[in-house]
Amino acid sequence: MMDFYNGWLEESIRIEKTVNEAPRVARGKSLNWVRTRQDSRAALMIAPETGFPTGGSLLMRAEIPVGWHTGKHIHGEEAIYIERGEGFLLLDEKRYDFRRATVFHIPYRSTHQLFNTGNEPVSYLSGLAWHLEAFIYMGHMEQIEDAGQNDSAGLAKVPREESQYWPTDGRRISIHEEQFDLSTETKHGATYFLMGRSGKQNGFKATAVAISSIFVDLPHSKSHSHAHPEAYLYALQGSGYSEIGGKRYEWDQGDAIHVPPGMMHHQHFNPTDHDMRELRFEYGIRYWIVDQWKGYTTIDRHMKATHLDD
């Protein structure tokens, strides 16, 4: 009979094999859309349920029909990007308006709900660390209201937005595209910081999950190359390919790219005549492990974006 220690050794081998053989790209055109109590239409992209070996995190896409709202619930931290549409977020009974490219950070266990007040469906991306929270038996999710049609009389009673900040401790809740912070870095054609790599930039206070930045890769160029623990990219615009762990992975607008846990070297390439834009999600668990061993410190091989032929 196998003892517990040999079981651990075998588990270590299995983990490495799983990460090496796992998918790297979630295809936006092949998603399994479902209706849930929270969303009229939602699909997991990068998640354990879809075969990705994440560090307890996930990326989801969801849509809110015209004249509808999401459910109202509470759970751990969440980072949201509005890909299309307009409306507002109610967070702890305070209103925060949104439009295309607005980014939200939902504090831990704050009640929240999204409302579509525009003339087209709202499409949004959501990053969560639900699986990690559940694994350590601290995952609490509570549904207060279900998704459904807006009540016009109720909407009329909602006060106007007062601030983009949370009155509880002053942290930032929302940021709009014109407020993104253009960096002087040369690792891509351009880099815009949102919550930043620490999750603390531009007034945010993200711990478990952050939308750190947007990368712009120019036509016929390649990004810098490096290795670090887990991160996600979502293709906002354009098409290209990434080299991760020595293998090439093609992707198009609407796809999501998974740089898995570990230290796989990776680089992103734009072989087209148009700009590429990638939205970057990162999760705080990576810094917990980075602080324990210098082998997980980011390793940069090429510090600047260059032409494809260089």
Model-derived regions: residue spans:
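Short acidic-glycine-tyrosine-enriched beta hairpin
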Residues: 79, 93-108, 246-262
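C-terminal functional regions that serve as terminal interaction/effector modules
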Residues: 210, 233-234, 247, 256-271, ...
